[in-house]
């Protein structure tokens, strides 16, 4: 182990997803080798993220305003809502250029072993959003685009149970074709676009 601030930096970097001890050490020593202005810029960006980035009050996506740019865009179809687990999944769907509706970010997936139940996700907000007729528009279709893994499928099944009795609402699930056990963010644009286009009705 190293001493003082160097080890503190390695420890903090190691808490980031996908960063193991060796990667954390490599990044730390890279940061030690760069010029002070570069460190200042990185510090400033982290400060802006801490102070200026929040979550959209409508969909839960990351935003620097109360409403994200997608929810604020009148060209987006408010009657079509795509439900995803995390903000990174919004970006994955956006890269396909196949979806012109809006989103609802759950903030995760059901995982009882990790203590994540329906109360820890933004499911109640989704139900309220459907019932409140956002901007005077009825939500006509909810596309469930949770990850194709055990937690994502459990979340999709739960959502179908919660949504299936709402009058006039169509509930669909993105089509198979995505690798089981994978994450939406790693799917290529063509595969994910086809999964959206081939979505199937759940009720």
Swiss-Prot record:
**Protein's UniProt name:** Recombination protein RecR
The lineage is:
Bacteria, Bacillati, Actinomycetota, Actinomycetes, Mycobacteriales
Kindly give the PROSITE patterns that the UniProt entry links to this protein.
Answer: RECR (PS01300), TOPRIM (PS50880)
Q: InterPro entries, from UniProt?
A: DNA_Rcmb_RecR, Hlx-hairpin-Hlx_DNA-bd_motif, Rcmb_RecR, Rcmb_RecR_Znf, TOPRIM_dom, TOPRIM_RecR
UniProt function note: May play a role in DNA repair. It seems to be involved in an RecBC-independent recombinational process of DNA repair. It may act with RecF and RecO.
Q: Which UniProt keywords apply?
A: DNA damage, DNA recombination, DNA repair, Metal-binding, Zinc, Zinc-finger
- Pfam families named in the record: RecR_C (PF21175), RecR_HhH (PF21176), RecR_ZnF (PF02132), Toprim_4 (PF13662)
Q: Which family does it belong to?
A: Belongs to the RecR family.
GO biological process, any:
DNA recombination
Q: What GO molecular function annotation could you give as one example from this UniProt entry?
A: zinc ion binding
- Entry keyword annotation includes Ubl conjugation: no
Residue ranges crossing the lipid bilayer per the database entry = none
Kindly list the ranges of residues that form C4-type zinc fingers according to the record.
56-71
Gene3D superfamilies hit by this protein: 3.30.60.80, 3.40.1360.10, 6.10.250.240, RecR Domain 1
Which segments constitute the Toprim domain? 79-179
């Amino acid at each position: 182990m190293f001493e003082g601030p160097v080890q503190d930096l390695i420890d903090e970097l190691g808490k980031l997803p996908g960063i193991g001890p060796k990667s954390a050490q490599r990044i730390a020593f890279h940061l030690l080798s760069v010029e002070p202005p570069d460190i200042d810029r990185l510090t400033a960006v982290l400060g802006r993220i801490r102070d200026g980035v929040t979550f959209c009050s409508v969909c839960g996506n990351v935003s620097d305003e109360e409403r994200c740019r997608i929810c604020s865009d009148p060209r987006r179809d408010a009657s079509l809502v795509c439900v995803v687990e995390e903000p990174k999944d919004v970006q994955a769907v956006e890269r396909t250029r196949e979806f012109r509706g809006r989103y609802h970010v759950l903030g995760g997936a059901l995982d009882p072993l990790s203590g994540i139940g329906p109360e820890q996700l933004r499911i109640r907000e989704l139900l309220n959003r459907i019932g409140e007729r956002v901007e005077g528009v009825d939500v006509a279709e909810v596309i469930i685009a949770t990850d194709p893994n055990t937690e994502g499928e459990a979340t999709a099944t739960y959502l179908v149970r919660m949504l299936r009795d709402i009058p006039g609402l169509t509930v669909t699930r993105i089509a198979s074709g995505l690798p089981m056990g994978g994450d939406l963010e790693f799917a290529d644009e063509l595969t994910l676009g086809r999964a959206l286009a081939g979505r199937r009705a759940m009720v």
